Amino acid sequence: MKNKIVFAPIGQGGGNIVDTLLGICGDYNALFINTSKKDLDSLKHAKHTYHIPYAEGCGKERKKAVGYAQTYYKQIIAQIMEKFSSCDIVIFVATMAGGTGSGITPPILGLAKQMYPNKHFGFVGVLPKATEDIDEHMNAIACWNDIMRSTNEGKDISIYLLDNNKREKESDINKEFATLFNDFMNMSESHAEGVVDEDEISKLLTMKKSNVILEFDDKEDIQVALAKSLKESIFAEYTTNTCEFMGISTTRVVDVEAIKSIVGYPRRTFKGYNSKKNIVVATGIEPQKTTVQMMNEIIEDKMKQRREVTSKSENMIIEPIALDDEDNKSVISSNEKEISIDNVEKEIDINDFFSKYM
């Protein structure tokens, strides 16, 4: 299954996620795309890279990134689709708050989907922390809207929406997603009691709309363990209690109905066993619009803070000290003569005058 997938991370954040995945398992295909050559050079496991010609980063400017996409879309898509023509599944990866990944990914994904209708496309997107700035949140919302517009509101692709608020460090999100995704792909490893096989993994992987991957500890009550796993998950929260397909791979017999009651009721379930971890993959969930929409509230709060600070800003005009009448009279009645511009160098030592300001 792994050799059927090509990851197309765009920008620094997306590149770091896939670089982490390749560090865990080098069997995946990947083409790293960036406007910054320095970011590409910093990757540890990248075999295939594409630097946007003449670009030196986007400075979190989405419009600039969209401009690069418009100019170089043929080259970008050709690099992915021709170099990895045997791959049936193309997964774009980007952090949504920046410039390069946020701006380039939606149009390239939308175009590639139209150009290659027989391929399956996915998107791994990362939402910003609440502490990030207004522009980052604006970028993330714009990226989400562009992805929704170019993919029939998420109905044409698989989405893995991660939330940086769920962990202190972004690197923790990267490592956890990489581990979860790789465990998902390994569910078909042999077990005497049966496994979730390759065909079933393919069905889970190519199901449209949003997907989540969970792991839970079976040392405590399964519903308690799963509720905890779902609450602490790196994936953006979803509000529906249904999904299309569910994959369950556990180390022992578990109450499947208890899992469904927490994660969501599927149309079809694939059940198997493994010797290492308890994994649940829920696919075909409605995209997490509510979570993304909450960023508008964050933006409003930050703008309100800025307005309050601006309204308290100190007046920059300095009021001069008024002179008393005698001083005023002495200035007015001064007998000193004016100096014309033509004679200034004769009357004033210019070098000495300006030396006081050096």
Curated annotation (Swiss-Prot):
Record: residues binding GTP: 182
GO cellular component entries: host cell cytoplasm
Its EC number(s): 3.6.5.-
Subcellular location: Host cytoplasm
Top class in the EC scheme: hydrolase
Taxonomic superkingdom: Viruses
Binding positions (GDP): 12-16, 95, 99-101, 132, 164, 170, 174
Xref: InterPro entries: Tubulin/FtsZ_GTPase_sf, Tubulin_CS, Tubulin_FtsZ_GTPase, TubZ_C_clostridia
Catalytic activity: GTP + H2O = GDP + phosphate + H(+)
A GO biological-process term: microtubule-based process
Residue ranges of coiled coil: none
GO molecular function, one term: GTP binding
KW Nucleotide-binding (keyword) present: yes
Keyword annotations of the record: GTP-binding, Host cytoplasm, Hydrolase, Nucleotide-binding, Plasmid partition
Location, primary (coarse class): host cell
Pfam families: Tubulin, TubZ_C_3
Assigned protein family: Belongs to the FtsZ family. TubZ subfamily.
Misc note: This bacteriophage also exists as a circular plasmid prophage in its host.
Subunit structure: Monomer. In the presence of Mg(2+) and GTP assembles into 2-stranded filaments which coalesce into bundles. Binds a centromere-like site (tubC)-TubR complex. The TubZ-TubR-tubC complex bind to TubY which reshapes the filament bundles into rings. A later paper by the same group shows 4-stranded filament formation and suggests the 2-stranded form is a short-lived intermediate.
Protein purpose: A tubulin-like, filament forming GTPase; the motor component of the type III partition system presumably used to ensure correct segregation of this bacteriophage. In the presence of Mg(2+) and GTP (or GTP-gamma-S) assembles into filaments which upon polymerization are almost exclusively bound to GDP. Filament formation is cooperative, requiring a critical concentration. Formation occurs very quickly and is followed by disassembly as GTP is consumed. Unlike its plasmid homolog in B.thuringiensis (AC Q8KNP3) GTP-gamma-S does not alter filament formation.
Record remark: domains: Consists of two domains: a nucleotide-binding N-terminus that hydrolyzes GTP and a C-terminus domain necessary for polymerization. The domains are bridged by a long, central helix. The C-terminus is thought to insert into the most distant monomer of the plus end of the filament, forming the complete active site and modulating filament assembly.
UniProt-recorded name of the protein: Tubulin-like protein TubZ
